[in-house]
Amino acid sequence: MSGVAAARERSRSIPVSSLHEIHRLVRLRGPETIALHVGEPYIRMPQAVTEAFARAVRDGLTSYTDAPGLPELREALAARFPGGGAPSPERVFVTPGSCQAIAAVLQSVAFEGGVALLPEVHWPIHLQQVLMAGLRPRFYADPAALDELWSPEVCALVVNSPANPSGVVLGEEAIAAAHAWAARRRVWLISDEAYEDFVYAGAPARPAALDAALPAGDRVVFSVRTFSKGFSMTGCRLGYVAAPTDERARLLRRVQEATLIAPSTPVQYAGLAALACGDAHLAAHHAYVRATRDEVVRLAGPLLRSVPDGGWYALLDLSAHTADSDALCRELLDSAGVAVAPGRGFVPPGDPRGPGLARLTLCWEREVTLEGVRRLLAFLGRGDAG
């Protein structure tokens, strides 16, 4: 197969995003829709961040930075890793969102015929990124039981905690088992920590802290984080990744230089301002989303696949009401004006669970969210829409 043909086949292997499909329908319907299909925060980003972005533009701070980003921002980001897990700033890369960071990491570790391990219930873009990197996906149910999926072709393990869409928070035992397995098998562990500031039960376990106990050359964890969630900077597209070793950082730099050139300079100055805000914004944002989660659990508890212990979403089990959640979500949008994300894209292709699932956002305005839940319950014919 020619290179062009191979690239064409790779593109065709990427599933169409069910999230973008419902998003297009919402845009067509108009602003009166209760949009609970997408993770858009009600809490706005700090005013100091807005001012820092505008000031950077006004002062002409719009030239290229180095591919890994502003040195002062990389240094500040390295300091956000607790204890012995802190990387050197030279191994921290500023990226246009955590999504691009994960894509770049996968491209930097991929090889011909390689395999990446993904959670069975996963963010659809993770699967798209794996396929785009030319890797083959395999899916795991338990991050503490990975040996049955092992083969020499496995090069990456993606872990997402708190998880999108389920809200599952992996405990210390599960994270330790996944890390030990990856270190023993020499598999790169990609830790998607986008929702690190939204843990409602237990304490977040961080693979990088475990990695720090290994000799420098044996470390395997890429820690990926974002400003989109805690700091409410979704449209700014600002994230970062810490590479496990100097060699991995050199290879990641090649990918970024070839695909990115450099992150947005004004946005990086906005990121510095966000970090200078301290924890007050993060604490208030966490409290708001958690209170919304509690109310959604009270209203819709029987529909939840499980109570989300973290993150911005709840995964609904609608299998008693439909065998086609895509159709149900379209009908819910048309008849009740409520958008939720159909579940097909959150599980492996062809998984029979997908048509019975849907994802509901918890991070939007509380009263609007609760009204959306009431409409959903009424639409399903339940009597407890309260």
What are these model-derived regions, one by one?
Residues 8-99, 104, 274-277, 383-386:
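N-terminal small-domain helix-loop-helix segment of the aminotransferase-like
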Residues 29, 133, 184-185, 336, ...:
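Helix C-cap/helix->beta junction micro-motif
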Residues 35, 224, 304-309:
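Short beta-strand
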Residues 61-180, 197-215, 384:
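Conserved core of the PLP fold type I
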Residues 79, 86, 331-340, 346-386:
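PLP-dependent enzyme catalytic core of the Aspartate aminotransferase-like
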Residues 118, 139, 191, 340-342:
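Hydrophobic residues in well-ordered beta-strands that form the structural core
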Residues 214-290, 379-380:
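Conserved core segment of the aminotransferase class I/II
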Residues 272, 288-297, 305-318, 356:
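Conserved glycine-rich beta-strand-loop-beta hairpin in the small C-terminal domain of fold type I
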